[in-house]
Regions:
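Extracytoplasmic/periplasmic substrate-recognition and gating elements
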Residues: 80-81, 107, 181-183, 248, ...
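Short, solvent-exposed loop/beta-turn-alpha elements that line the ligand-binding surface or hinge
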Residues: 134-147, 218, 234-259, 309-314, ...
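Long, aromatic- and glycine/proline-rich binding clefts that accommodate carbohydrate-like moieties
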Residues: 319-322, 373-430, 438
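Extracytoplasmic "Venus flytrap"/periplasmic binding protein-like
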Residues: 76-147, 156, 162, 178-190, ...
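Glycine-centered hinge/linker elements that transmit conformational signals in sensory
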Residues: 199-200, 245-278
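Extracytoplasmic/periplasmic solute-binding protein
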Residues: 157-166, 171, 196-248, 265, ...
Length: 463
């Protein structure tokens, strides 16, 4: 019967399907998915359009707050000649500059370009905060032979050159010629006794209540240079403060340092030194002299252009430079300079290249001329380390308007770098300012002041 045959038919049907499947499985393998077509090469980055410059390399430049309009104009001129470099100017008050920059260094935030000074160089260079210029730029030493020795010394640490001079100058003794003549004197003081006698006469005759003013504010960075100049003028040769091994030589009664501080103490007590000196900074010192309130002062020479500026007051043109009073007439010569931090190299080759172009443009020669240095000299009366500029007719004419060029040159020849320039000099300087104040005010003896100065020096040296 048909129903009895169904299992057989089902069996045959299933068998046929199984065989077909096996035959299919033994056939050619299924084709692999097609390999992806190679991607078209990416189009090359578009070249800058013809005449279109790449973005300039940006460098920060930090200065103290003097002549900012002139600085920015010099930057503009530099950028016009070097469009691949962009300089960003930032300034801090001179009174705060050292501490502000130390704070930035310590915080890991140094600018690649900045102002430096001889009395901070050893501190900053030994800490690695400044970069020696002669390593990436060996050509910097080509300028060394044209620099005043005291200036080159002030930019050198461990035989490496750390700067190109922004300006270099002497600390000068300045007097009001009209007032001195009114008191009956025809010549400037040659000794500190002369200065005392003239000051007494000026005070007694009512010409000036306080014949002398100094910028001895404890925040005035140039005060130590004025103090050392008073010491140098009394001392002949090296060793006025420190010997060749940076050991103190000043801590003895009768030393030039003792005599200088004693003179100030006695002048303060006698009413010859204005008490305001102990809180006066340089700008106010200049204004006070211009007003006729004082006859004598000691200050950086570049201030002479401002003192004798036409129409600046009754005594414009009447302020004269004299050699520093004392047996040797020596004074301090100092340098402020353009410096570079290690950050410039960290920023790469383009930053280094722009840094050198900037440094040479500002502190070196452009087309064979010290263009920027000469501008500061002619327009602002800034002194300079670049000796060939003394022969420049424009400089001679400009300096002759506010000073006796022969006296300026004579004092420059007698100028000496500060002794004791070490990594701890800056810290000792700040300590010393306060100690000298105590002596002037009679809060402690001059010998106690000198002893404290020596003890602090030795403590710092031992660290």
């Amino acid at each position: 019967m048909t129903p009895k045959r169904l299992p057989s038919l089902l069996f045959l049907l299933l068998a046929a399907l199984t065989i077909a499947a096996l035959i299919g499985g033994c056939g050619a393998p299924a084709a692999e998915p097609p390999a992806a077509e190679p991607a078209e090469p990416a189009a090359p980055a578009a070249e800058p359009a013809e005449g279109e410059a790449a973005a300039p390399t940006s460098l920060d430049f930090v200065v103290w707050s003097y002549g900012l309009e002139t600085i920015q104009d010099n930057i503009n001129n530099f950028q016009a000649a070097n469009p691949e470099c962009q300089i960003n100017l930032k300034d801090y008050s001179w009174l705060d500059y050292h501490d502000t920059m130390v704070g930035r260094f310590a915080a890991g935030d140094p600018p690649p370009l900045l102002y430096g000074s001889d009395h901070w160089l050893q501190e900053w260079a030994s800490a690695g905060w400044l970069a020696p210029l002669n390593e990436p730029f060996p050509q910097v030493t080509d300028y060394s032979g044209e620099l005043a020795p005291y200036a080159l010394q002030g930019m050198t640490y461990n035989d490496d050159v750390y700067g190109l001079s922004y300006y270099a100058d002497t600390i000068d003794f300045v007097y009001n010629e009209d007032q001195l003549k009114a008191a009956g004197f025809d010549a400037a003081p040659q000794s500190w006794q002369d200065l005392w006698d003239m000051s007494v006469a000026l005070k007694e005759q009512g010409i000036t209540e306080y014949p002398m003013i100094l910028a001895f504010s404890q925040s005035e960075g140039a005060s130590i240079e004025a103090m050392i100049s008073m010491i140098y003028g009394r001392h002949t040769g090296e060793g006025a403060l420190f010997d060749a091994n940076n050991q103190p030589t000043f801590n003895s009664e009768g030393s030039a340092a003792y005599e200088a501080i004693e003179w100030l103490r006695q002048a303060y007590e006698a009413g010859l030194l204005d008490p305001a000196s102990l809180s006066t900074a340089e700008i106010d010192q200049v204004k006070s002299m211009q007003s006729g309130a004082h006859t004598f002062t000691i200050l950086p020479q570049y201030n002479m252009a401002e003192l004798n500026k036409p129409d600046s007051g009754e005594f414009a043109g009447k302020f004269k430079i004299a050699l520093m009073p004392g047996d040797s007439h020596a004074t301090v010569g100092y340098v402020r300079f353009y410096a570079m931090s290690p950050k410039a190299a960290e920023m790469g080759d383009a930053a280094l290249a722009c840094s050198w172009k900037f440094l040479e443009y500002f502190g070196g020669k452009t087309d064979g001329t010290y263009t920027v240095v000469k501008r500061w000299a002619v327009e602002n009366g800034l002194g300079f380390a670049q000796l060939p500029l003394f022969q420049d007719p424009d400089v001679q004419e400009a300096f002759g308007k506010w000073g006796d060029v022969d006296v300026i040159a004579a004092q420059a020849e007698l100028a000496r770098a500060k002794e004791g320039l070490t990594p701890w000099f800056g810290a000792w300087d700040v300590f010393t300012r306060a100690e000298i104040h105590k002596a002037i005010l009679g809060q402690q003896s001059t010998m106690d002041t000198l002893a404290n100065m020596e003890a602090e020096w030795n403590r710092l040296a031992a660290q």
